[in-house]
From Swiss-Prot:
This is Putative pterin-4-alpha-carbinolamine dehydratase. One of its GO terms (biological process) is tetrahydrobiopterin biosynthetic process. The lineage of its organism: Bacteria, Pseudomonadati, Pseudomonadota, Alphaproteobacteria, Hyphomicrobiales. It comes from Nitrobacter hamburgensis (strain DSM 10229 / NCIMB 13809 / X14). Keywords: Lyase. Its EC number is 4.2.1.96.
């Protein structure tokens, strides 16, 4: 099982992640990605889904038209772990392929 990050480590990791923030009232991180249209948003989700499945670590997410809202936390660890940080980094890299910084 992945170990939950300390508060200091979590804050430092989130600070280094473009667009991500801590979720109020919950030990989790979140980001909203906005694409040009639904096709791009869905394409992003499809690519992320492959990464998530390969790593057996799945996001909580919601898609409305061109927006994808994401929350990451490792439920078994009760908070944010290195697995969440790595998935957030991968999501940012995939979003950049669509021109989303």
């Amino acid at each position: 099982m992945a170990e939950r990050l300390s508060e200091d480590a979590r804050k430092a990791a989130v600070k280094a992640l473009s667009g991500w923030s801590e979720v109020a009232g919950r030990e989790a991180i979140a980001r909203v990605f906005t694409f040009r249209d639904f096709n791009e948003a869905f394409g992003f989700m499809a690519r992320v889904a492959l990464v998530a499945e390969k790593n057996d670590h799945h996001p909580e997410w919601r898609n409305v038209y061109k927006t994808v809202e994401v929350v990451l936390a490792t439920h078994d660890a009760g908070g944010v772990t290195e697995r969440d940080i790595r998935l957030a980094e991968a999501m940012n890299a995939i979003a950049r392929q669509f021109g989303v910084a």
